[in-house]
């Protein structure tokens, strides 16, 4: 008699719902998943090894490219580790700016996650709405750093520069006439803080729009409720952090438990779920966007009232300002030496972790007293979540696999490193 065996097939690495170069070896019995074996490494770029051959200040840009949806949050973890080794603390204004941009980054991440998650499950409209809001936040990145994604804005000792007094403006083109451009530039007449304040005033109603399309939608709930359940106890055992852990009912958030930057000075709540399924992960991230909006408004109010320095006054670490560097020969040499050779970091080791949008993003640095790190180890926030794919998917239908992958919010820049 012929042996009856399960069917095995490849999911990815070129699948549009794989969220990057993910390859899953899926074993099914009919339509029911029996086993999943994730294969990673297709986006490995040896970031940790590259950091060992570069001065400390030249590796900040690599952090942007790990989780390339949560750029400044990655920078924050790396910069905090260097500041621990150097024994320095940034000015309070720089802390508030970092807090504000960490939360802008959180909203950027969650908007992309929500749009992609909805699209994977079959809801096209939300995807378009989310990218509409992301444009405004990308413009905030561009205003402070000149780049829409890879900002390299956080520096050991503070931030690259203070917030600008004006916003980039749209110009007439073949697609937008002067009347349309004038309307598009209405919110851009003031400073960056004015623009962010205007966005935070509009954003809660926009979140309501997303919820009106999804939260009580019968099809959405059928595709997400009771799918990919992880209990609180099991989530802790698997090393879950961030929204994945909180959706399982564990109230753990580094911003509250181990405050950094200005998080101990702002008021916000930690949303938690009950069931630990795809639907709870959605609800937790939706509420996180509301709380991030609340934090940003508090930061804007404080920054308007409290001008001050955004970088420490230590010329062994901080290069001269560009205006000074272009006028003075000694400042030019100083600037050149710091950016090419960097600075000496005392011997020691430090671990710094931040509550990145996907979970705990940690950076462990070992210094041997040189201008380059002896070893850099990155704790990717979403790595443990992907490792639990087999447990979350077993017993579900093939169609549920896509919903579970998109609910865990993975980016292979940081998983493969």
From Swiss-Prot:
Its EC number is 7.1.1.-. GO terms for cellular component: plasma membrane. GO terms for molecular function: NAD binding; NADH:ubiquinone reductase (non-electrogenic) activity; quinone binding. InterPro entries: NADH_Q_OxRdtase_suD, NADH_UbQ_OxRdtase_49kDa_CS, NDH1_su_D/H, NiFe-Hase_large. It is found in: Cell inner membrane. Keywords: Cell inner membrane, Cell membrane, Membrane, NAD, Quinone, Translocase, Transport, Ubiquinone. It catalyses: a quinone + NADH + 5 H(+)(in) = a quinol + NAD(+) + 4 H(+)(out). It comes from the Bacteria. Coiled coil: none annotated. It is a peripheral membrane protein. It is an enzyme of class 7 (translocase). The keyword ATP-binding does not apply. NDH-1 is composed of 14 different subunits. Subunits NuoB, C, D, E, F, and G constitute the peripheral sector of the complex. Belongs to the complex I 49 kDa subunit family. HAMAP family: NDH1_NuoD (MF_01358). NDH-1 shuttles electrons from NADH, via FMN and iron-sulfur (Fe-S) centers, to quinones in the respiratory chain. The immediate electron acceptor for the enzyme in this species is believed to be ubiquinone. Couples the redox reaction to proton translocation (for every two electrons transferred, four hydrogen ions are translocated across the cytoplasmic membrane), and thus conserves the redox energy in a proton gradient. This is NADH-quinone oxidoreductase subunit D. It comes from Coxiella burnetii (strain CbuG_Q212) (Coxiella burnetii (strain Q212)). The lineage of its organism: Bacteria, Pseudomonadati, Pseudomonadota, Gammaproteobacteria, Legionellales. The gene is nuoD.
